[in-house]
Amino acid sequence: MSTTQSERLRGLLEPLVSAQQLDLEEIEVSRAGRRGVLRIIVDSEEGVELDACAELSRAISEKLDETDAMGEGEYVLEVSSPGADRPLTEHRHYVRATGRLARFHLAGDGSGELVARILAVDEEGLDLEVPGVKGRKPTARRLAFDEIARARVEIEFNRKDKKEEEA
């Protein structure tokens, strides 16, 4: 059975990422001219600090230099967090997005698209708060995971944090 370069890299790098209490979200190998590009996306419950990315990048670079996982040619290594508008693809992503606004593309004939705040997450699905339209109050909605085709966190520029709401 053949393994892809990404699978080999995942096996090699996952222990390094886990040792820093981070989750390995994605590995992407591509080309930029004559150089290879290795993009590694990591995350954690608390988010990822820039210093953690830099430290992990050094550890990964050392490990890759010890092996031939990236071949003999030159490559660029990029280690980063998933970003503010990350796609939600795993249960832990939804848990981390609790309290945030998300855009859901519904599966099948589920009426297309829904924007709602994630209030709670369990093994079967999500409890959501759908914002009211034209002065109406928000409504509660339950959404099962199998009803979701795609989901992504929405960036909110004018959201008050909890301290502001309590004041």
UniProtKB/Swiss-Prot annotation:
Keywords: Cytoplasm, Ribosome biogenesis. Its main location: cytoplasm. It comes from the Bacteria. It is found in: Cytoplasm. GO terms for biological process: ribosomal small subunit assembly; translation. It holds the Pfam family RimP_N. Disulfide bonds: none annotated. Gene3D superfamilies: RimP-like superfamily, N-terminal (3.30.300.70). One of its GO terms (cellular component) is cytosol. InterPro entries: Ribosome_maturation_RimP, RimP_C, RimP_C_sf, RimP_N, RimP_N_sf. Coiled coil: none annotated. Belongs to the RimP family. Required for maturation of 30S ribosomal subunits. This is Ribosome maturation factor RimP. It comes from Streptomyces griseus subsp. griseus (strain JCM 4626 / CBS 651.72 / NBRC 13350 / KCC S-0626 / ISP 5235).
